[in-house]
Swiss-Prot record:
Annotated InterPro entries: Snake_3FTx, Snake_toxin-like_sf, Snake_toxin_con_site, Toxin_cobra-type
Membrane-crossing residue ranges in chain numbering: none
Family indicated by similarity: Belongs to the three-finger toxin family. Short-chain subfamily. Orphan group XII sub-subfamily.
Gene Ontology MF terms in the entry: toxin activity
Lineage of the species this protein comes from: Eukaryota, Metazoa, Chordata, Craniata, Vertebrata
Annotated tissue distribution: Expressed by the venom gland.
Protein name, as recorded: Alpha-neurotoxin homolog 1
Organism the protein comes from: Micrurus corallinus (Brazilian coral snake)
Length: 78
């Protein structure tokens, strides 16, 4: 019984992956707030001609006129 309980605890910890969630700023247009990102990656997207960057979770690809900065620490995209 103890072995079964220990196995369930280990499986739960591995499946939930506690160590890889971080807090990122999330902003579109004029509002700015934080969000928990399960991916463990934050981004800041700077588009030429737009004064405020877009921020969020993940790491989108950059393109012509768009610079994307990705990072992996709490609130690193601020």
């Amino acid at each position: 019984m103890k072995t079964l309980l220990l196995t369930l605890v280990v499986v739960t910890i591995v499946c939930l992956d506690f160590g890889y969630t971080i807090v990122c700023y999330k902003r579109h247009a004029s509002d700015s707030q934080t969000t928990t990102c399960l991916s463990g990656i934050c981004y800041k997207k700077i588009t030429r001609g737009i004064s405020r960057p877009e921020m969020g979770c993940g790491c989108p690809q950059s393109s012509r006129g768009v610079k994307v900065e990705c990072c992996m620490r709490d609130k690193c995209n601020g």
